[in-house]
């Protein structure tokens, strides 16, 4: 049995936003509320990064069009006593997925701790 740090990626749609910063604030706030409601206050929330195709620098993973944004969010948590890295991902997806019912989740990284 091992302990793992699992990072998942989620996409969140934020409506009626003015700009990128507003979209990020709304997404983090709403996901935080959902996680806290599910007693998952131990899950870390961060904005995902993507690489700018022009300059190669990392930028926030946000697209705003017509006051609607899609925001890439990273959710990370520690999973204890998992049988394997794959088992740790399943545990994390199950725990977080219960709170974020209609938000798709994808595993990004699993590190043994």
Swiss-Prot record:
InterPro entries: UPF0212 (IPR007564). Transmembrane segments: none annotated. NCBIfam families: PRK03922.1 (NF003035). PANTHER family: UPF0212 PROTEIN MJ0068, UPF0212 PROTEIN TK1194. Belongs to the UPF0212 family. This is UPF0212 protein MMP1509.
